[in-house]
């Protein structure tokens, strides 16, 4: 419905307005003309990454639950549902508290050692490589040793002149990574 975020509510015949763009702009202190990319954390918490921050918004109460600063280059970002955020930068894993203090979980210098990233290309129904305990106090993650895996060239067509970028890719019948 234009500038409204709509949702189906069990037992109701018509979709309901979950949040308006005006409400979102008020919470983000922004002047968005349309809805940014978002994902659902649970049935009522909306997650938006914008301008170096991760916003968690309670759509029922129309309030910001958490605002996390995100380091430049952070990937695989995940929240513990409380006041901690974990992510990867390069091949290492970090977490940050609600005050923006960053802590290194790993410090591997070898580019063949990858922490906190998906293994096996999101196969077997597992998405991601960082997992919070149910109480949000402990962090589990995959550690992948790709030192025996061959490289595979990919063509990056986003640049004006296509450029090659190499990734580690275990071809069938060849050595694969060791996960721990």
Region roles according to the model:
Residues 1-180:
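Beta-propeller folds
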């Amino acid at each position: 419905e234009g500038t409204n975020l709509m949702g189906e509510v069990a037992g109701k015949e018509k979709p309901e307005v979950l949040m308006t763009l005006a409400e979102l702009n008020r919470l983000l202190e922004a002047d968005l003309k349309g809805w940014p990319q978002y994902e659902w954390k649970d049935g009522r918490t909306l997650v938006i990454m914008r301008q170096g921050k991760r916003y968690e918004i309670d759509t029922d109460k129309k309030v910001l639950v958490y605002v996390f600063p995100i380091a430049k280059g952070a990937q695989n970002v995940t929240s513990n549902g409380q006041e901690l955020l974990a992510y990867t930068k390069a091949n290492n894993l970090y977490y940050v508290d609600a005050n923006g203090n960053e802590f290194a979980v790993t410090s591997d210098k070898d580019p063949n050692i990858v922490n906190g990233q998906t293994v096996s290309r999101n196969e077997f129904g597992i998405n991601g490589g960082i997992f919070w305990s149910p109480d949000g106090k402990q962090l589990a993650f995959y550690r992948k040793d790709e030192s025996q895996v061959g490289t595979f060239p990919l063509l990056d067509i986003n640049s004006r002149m296509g450029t090659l970028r190499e990734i580690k890719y275990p071809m069938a019948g060849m050595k694969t990574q060791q996960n721990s």
